[in-house]
Amino acid sequence: MNASIRGTQRRVAGHVGSLLFHVVYVTPIFWFVELLQNQLYWKLTGAPGWTYPRSPYHWFSFESLGLWGGSVVLIWCLHFFWFQRRGVGMVKRMIIAGTLCWAGEWLSGFVADQVFHRPLQIWTNAPLVYVQFSALFFWWWDVLLYQLLTVDIASLGRAAPPAPESSSST
């Protein structure tokens, strides 16, 4: 096997390892943040922001862990394959990734309900049913939280840059 193929395999393995680490690390944190966001929304408005009709608890669901994992994959891919390479600033990252995740939340809710007839989340009094426009702020915050949780962790698995040579003055 030639060196370029081995190098490519190592890079792919490093990216896959990084992605898996992020999914395992960030997904449960996002899920707990969702619980807090729903509780905050409930305290401010008097009703939960969203409910889970199939969950016995109604205000949270373990099924949403899969969606949170998907959002971590999306944010990670945007980070590695777009934002990092183009030097996209944090505010733009928040707006782009958060808005895409918001649209993904609506799409997943629509597909779960209309295609599979297994509604996942229903937003209270929302014209879009599966997400509300106010959720954009939650999603933008989640992208910022992702960045704060993974700063410097994003490059795990990559070779460290060579240390600068020190000059001794003895």
What are these regions (language model features)?
Residues 1-170:
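Aromatic-rich, lipid-facing transmembrane alpha helices and their immediate juxtamembrane interface loops
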